[in-house]
Each structure stands twice: as structure tokens, then as C-alpha cells.
């Protein structure tokens, strides 16, 4: 850098200033639009807050800086190259660029040749667009941009997660159909990290957060061996991923679920060989580095609906409901899943109910009340007693 504030703080290339907070967030609140970038950065390298040992990020010792460059992305990429950036996370998606896709691809290729590993979520457009345009720019760029699709906690594909392949038929690129995405990560029911360092359960959905998991994994790998190039990273992370869908590479989850532990071990194994050291302790499988997919899915058949973010002055707030409370029933119907909620709400409409009985649980305490038809005033999330990883 040149010693100016952007070296550590980042830069807004659209406004040509250092303002990266475009939407203010009041203390004690969560604004999904305002904190989208904050959450992405937290997933990559968040370290929690003072006095709280909980580390939120995948690579908590990594350093990050932000850029805003919707209109001047070339300047942002050039700046990242000059700053010596290792990886560059892009949780946005642009449709319908036509021939201009070639320009994006060329810029990303140049950045990749300069050593930057570009990462993006696969997009959230499976229910809105057809293949091969579910994945848009930049996640549709081959080789230079790595895309992460999304799975739920039970490893089923998230319905909105965009699928490949993509297609390239421009004046400059004639690849035809190209396999995408590269891998997948969790993208549904993720915890929120608030500005004060506290967390709220299961409040985030979207491939905007699968991409940063990919980016964090790459940062972790680079901490083990900073000399790796983008194509090395891609080969290692795809070869160590855990297959969670159709056998082999597929258009929904790519090579499979990112396995950070195995990826870093493979990095250390290759590094040991390159340095003429014994790679033995990094070779082979270990207990805990393999997922028992069938066993975990069986345990995850039992779920509950927990309260995520509570809307101020909404029906749930007026009843005194807090994040973490469990919705037991709605309209006298048991609610243990999102589908249960949908069925119960449809039945309430069919019954033309003017008042709907709701039951919540907070520990041993039961909270009963009545809702009017309409928004419940909280974001429901699915929780399980079993951890995903053992």
C-alpha cells in the first residue's frame, strides 16, 4: 500500500471515498441489507468480540478489507492486486450482461494470474430462471471465479440454490456448456452475528453466505501455505470435498461439501513433499474427517421451529417472544418444520380463523397466546439437537 487509509480500511470506488457504511444500523438491531457485507466478512475471518471466546469466522486470524465497486469493478480489482490480496469474495450476482460478460471474465482472469482467488456464491435463482442462466456474473466465469452452491443442514440441496452448467457463447469465448458450481457449503438457517458480538440462531439464508465459506476455507489453506496459486487451491479443495449428492461431480453441488480439515491437511502434505520433509503425518484418513451422511440425515429427521429475529412491535414481540423460543403449535397444529407452519397457516385461512392460538416454549415455561392472521412477527428457523459434525 501507500500508507493511506484505504490500505487498512478499504475504499468505495463508486463514491471515490472511504465510506463503506451506506446504511446505518442502530445499536441492538439487525438490518439484513445493511449488514450483508458485515456477515460475509464475519463468516470469512470473524473473531467475535472482546471477552467472548467464540470465533465466528473460518479463518479468524485472516485480515480483511472491503470495497464497494458496482460501477468501477476494474479499479477495485486493480487495487486488490496492488494490495497483495490473496482472495476476493463477491456475494452479488448480475444478470443479462450479454457480450459484457467477456469483459468481466477477462478482468477476473487477469486478477487470477496475479494470484487472487476469486470466490462467489452460486446465486439464488433456481426457482426463477432456467439452466444455463441460473448462475449469473461473476459466478458463471470458468476457472478464474470459484462458485459455491448451497445445501441445508441435512445435506439436501437448498431449493433456491442456482444450478449449473453455465454457457459461454460470446465473441471472445466459445466454451459452450461449462460445469458449475465447483463445491457447496451451508447456506440456510445460519446464525446472525450482531455488531456487539452476540449471535442469534438461524437467521440467514442464501448463497451470499456459501461463497464466504468457500473464501474462508481458501484463506485457511493459504495460512498453511501462502505460496499456493488459485489453480492449486481449486484442485485441492475440490479433490477433498465430501460428495453429498449424485456420485461424482454434479450440477447442483459440484464436487461436494467443502471439507476444511481435509483440505488443509492436503495443503500441508504437499508442502512437506515440496520442502523434502516427511509427509506421513498428513497422509491418510483420520477419525472425524469423514461425514456419516446417512447417519446424520437420520438424526436430523427430528427438528423444532425456533424463533430467529423478532420484528419490533410485531405480534410475536407483543406476546413477549424472544429469539430462541420454540414454536410448539399454530392453530392447534404441531409445528416442527417449515412445512408444518405452512400447512397450519393454510388451514387457518381455510377455517377463516379470526384469532389463531399459538403456543411457544422457553425452557420449561409454556407461553400461550393468540395471533391475528398475517405476519407472525418473527423469522422461524429449524433447529436440531444433534450437531452436524462429530
List the predicted regions and their residue ranges.
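Extracellular S/T/G-rich loop segment that most often corresponds to the catalytic His/Ser-adjacent loop
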Residues: 2-3, 16, 136-223
Amino acid at each position: 500500500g501507500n500508507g493511506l487509509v484505504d490500505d487498512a480500511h478499504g475504499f468505495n470506488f463508486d463514491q471515490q471515498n472511504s465510506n463503506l457504511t451506506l446504511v446505518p444500523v442502530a445499536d441492538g438491531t439487525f438490518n439484513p441489507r445493511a449488514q450483508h457485507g458485515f456477515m460475509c466478512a464475519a463468516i470469512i475471518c470473524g473473531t467475535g468480540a472482546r471477552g467472548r471466546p467464540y470465533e465466528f469466522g473460518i479463518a479468524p486470524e485472516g485480515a480483511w478489507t472491503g470495497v464497494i465497486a458496482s460501477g468501477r469493478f476494474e479499479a477495485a480489482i486493480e487495487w486488490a492486486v496492488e494490495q497483495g490480496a490473496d482472495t476476493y469474495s463477491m456475494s452479488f450476482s448480475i444478470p443479462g450482461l450479454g457480450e459484457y460478460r467477456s469483459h468481466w471474465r477477462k478482468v477476473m482472469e487477469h486478477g487470477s494470474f496475479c494470484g487472487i482467488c476469486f470466490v462467489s456464491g452460486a446465486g439464488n435463482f433456481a426457482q426463477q430462471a432456467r439452466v444455463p442462466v441460473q448462475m449469473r456474473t461473476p459466478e458463471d466465469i470458468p476457472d478464474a471465479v470459484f462458485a459455491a452452491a448451497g445445501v441445508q443442514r441435512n445435506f439436501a440441496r437448498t431449493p433456491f440454490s442456482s444450478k449449473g452448467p453455465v454457457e459461454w457463447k460470446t465473441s471472445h469465448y466459445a466454451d459452450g456448456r461449462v460445469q458449475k458450481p465447483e463445491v457447496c457449503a451451508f447456506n440456510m438457517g445460519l446464525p446472525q452475528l450482531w455488531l456487539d458480538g452476540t449471535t442469534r440462531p438461524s437467521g440467514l439464508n442464501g448463497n451470499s453466505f456459501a461463497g464466504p465459506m468457500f473464501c474462508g476455507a481458501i484463506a485457511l489453506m493459504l495460512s498453511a501455505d501462502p505460496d499456493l496459486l488459485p489453480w492449486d487451491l481449486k484442485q485441492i479443495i475440490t479433490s477433498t470435498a465430501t460428495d453429498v449428492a449424485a456420485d461424482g461431480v454434479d450440477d447442483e453441488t459440484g464436487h461436494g461439501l467443502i471439507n476444511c480439515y481435509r483440505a488443509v491437511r492436503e495443503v500441508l502434505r504437499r508442502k512437506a513433499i515440496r520442502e523434502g520433509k516427511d509427509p506421513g503425518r498428513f497422509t491418510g484418513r483420520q477419525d472425524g474427517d469423514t461425514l456419516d451422511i446417512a447417519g446424520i440425515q437420520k438424526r436430523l429427521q427430528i427438528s423444532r421451529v425456533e424463533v430467529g429475529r423478532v420484528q419490533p412491535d410485531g405480534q410475536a414481540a407483543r406476546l413477549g417472544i424472544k429469539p430462541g423460543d420454540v414454536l410448539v403449535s399454530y392453530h392447534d397444529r404441531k409445528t416442527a418444520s417449515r412445512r408444518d407452519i405452512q400447512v397450519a397457516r393454510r388451514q387457518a385461512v381455510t377455517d377463516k380463523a379470526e384469532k389463531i392460538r399459538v403456543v411457544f416454549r422457553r425452557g420449561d415455561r409454556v407461553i400461550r397466546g393468540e395471533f391475528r392472521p398475517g405476519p407472525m412477527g418473527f423469522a422461524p428457523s429449524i433447529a436440531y439437537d444433534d450437531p452436524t459434525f462429530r
